[in-house]
Amino acid sequence: MNYPHEFDVIVVGGGHAGTEAALAAARSGAKTLLLTHNIETLGQMSCNPSIGGIGKGHLVKEVDALGGAMAIATDEAGIQFRILNSSKGPAVRATRAQADRVLYRKAIRHRLENQENLWLFQQSVEDLIVEGDKVVGAVTQIGLKFRGRAVVLTAGTFLNGLIHVGLQHYSGGRAGDPPANSLGQRLKELKLPQGRLKTGTPPRIDGRTINYSVLEEQPGDLDPIPVFSFMGSAALHPRQLPCWITHTNERTHDIIRGGLDRSPMYSGVIEGIGPRYCPSIEDKIHRFADKPSHQIFLEPEGLDTHEVYPNGVSTSLPFDVQYELIHSLPGLEHAHILRPGYAIEYDYFDPRGLKSSLETKAISGLFFAGQINGTTGYEEAAAQGLLAGINAARYASDREAWVPRRDEAYLGVLVDDLVTRGVTEPYRMFTSRAEYRLSLREDNADLRLTEIGRELGLVDDIRWDVFNRKRDAIQAEVQRLQSTWVNPRLLPEEPAQALLGKAIEREYALADLLKRPNISYEALMQARNGAGELLAGPGLLGDDVLAEQVEIQIKYAGYIERQRDEVQKHVVHEQQAIPADIDYDAVSSLSFEVRQKLKTHRPETVGQAARISGVTPAAVSLLLIHLKRLHYGKRAI
């Protein structure tokens, strides 16, 4: 039957991409339907119980700045928080949290069930309704037809999913869930370019059978306690737990080597390529054969469970080998395995077949987000889901898509990398992928994106008010420090020596003093003048977030300004559109190889064309000349 109501946006899948897509579309004002095979697993953390990390935490902060759910849900569910790279510069510092799986799922479901314009329905999707080259709905396993103006597909690892444990394999979307084989077959019929990828997960351990006395404890950060959401606070955090560290040894490695002949990876059973930066334990032992030991993190899965996730031993080895290797680890000699580790192969679609909006080029109104695009990780999925949800809603209401630039957000870097370069292995975000990372920091994600989110209809009044007060306070303090001056009379030799390590010989703005590498904002605010009074006043002391932002903006002002100038030089051609119907064969001055690459990838902008492997700067110049001729030719007509 046909469902009696139509929707603007239909989201298929309730993982990290699907939930953010549904929330974003609904917040944008679109009548949205989220279809999931099981409402109980909405927001499920299928693999590791953690959110964030280098590059990944930046994406989570950006999703949050645009009104998304992942960061605040992590604050409500996080049982350990840490800042990675805390001793390095602000551009590469990153937040990471261990999360209670049950609390996280509960936090996400609460937001889904209380979001206006959003309907939930439990049914697996087996088919898409496509009319001509346009998607108009989805069909569930009982033949129920839902019609909508746009469809966002976030199928994760479910498309023709195949689970491997040793040389045994069976169909599944993840352990305990059926695959989406019918939908996978339907997508193949649409002639979308596709391939196979692989990911894996470790066996889970009963924490009551671990000997913690021989392990190294790894507590979370306490001063200050990190917070993920710009709307969050440490008061939201549940009880905190430590993680623990153990190591592999030569016996572990011998056990693994002895089982490689029954490994689906090394016996040729698995076709898909796995994530480079999250390799299986057998892959690590094989690739780094000279390394005598590998670190393993034992991560608690939640407050009300004894289950422990051994991060670092993802494996698809036979269970008897898994059993032996786990028991070879210090502290785990008598550990009970609750669930076996496994690898899963699944279909993905070449993201070069997508527009930058994440709409497929072949089928109008069909958007892809998450692992279906060849990425790995909850954070990458959530970011894509948010963007796909925004643009599906805009498509449904005949509005222009929003696409962040590489200099605006890690989300812009992520999408541009995918649609321009494609993937040959699961894509993971790192700060090193962003050429403008000094400007794209975790700490300023809201200052970069919340105003845009407000314009897109994603940011509610409460968040908008909090953001405005924060932004105004930072701007006022920066201006005060830039316009307040001190001279040798106000700061005589003795207090100057205490603050600066030497006397000042002329007048300085407080901002100039703060730019010095050995001066912190806190030290400047606590400095006294010759009369024993505060030199700069209390300022924003007491609010670590605002104080940090003021210090970063002033200390890095010169570097950021140079980067801004660099962006301005590139942005003119970066965003210059290339007509969808351009005839590259008419650009005879381009080499045959370059013309073939451009015809294959069909870049949307000159910036995208420039990042295609093999397209040289000289070729870009020739393309610009041709586009200029086309422009003037149209004007003449």
UniProtKB/Swiss-Prot annotation:
Name a single GO biological process.
tRNA wobble uridine modification
Task: List the record's Gene Ontology CC terms alphabetically.
Answer: cytosol
Query: Which residues take part in binding FAD?
Result: 13-18
Cofactor names = FAD
Do you know which PROSITE patterns this protein is assigned to?
A: GIDA_1, GIDA_2
A single GO molecular function term of this UniProt record? flavin adenine dinucleotide binding
Primary location recorded for the protein, binned into one broad class = cytoplasm
Locations listed in the record: Cytoplasm
InterPro entries annotated for this entry? FAD/NAD-bd_sf (IPR036188), GIDA_C_N (IPR049312), MnmG (IPR004416), MnmG-rel (IPR002218), MnmG-rel_CS (IPR020595), MnmG_C (IPR026904), MnmG_C_subdom (IPR047001), MnmG_C_subdom_sf (IPR044920)
Q: Which domain of life is it from?
A: Bacteria
Q: Is-annotated flag, keyword Flavoprotein? A: yes
Functionally, this protein is described as follows: NAD-binding protein involved in the addition of a carboxymethylaminomethyl (cmnm) group at the wobble position (U34) of certain tRNAs, forming tRNA-cmnm(5)s(2)U34.
The record's similarity note reads: Belongs to the MnmG family.
Protein name per Swiss-Prot or TrEMBL:
tRNA uridine 5-carboxymethylaminomethyl modification enzyme MnmG
Which species does this protein come from? Bordetella avium (strain 197N)
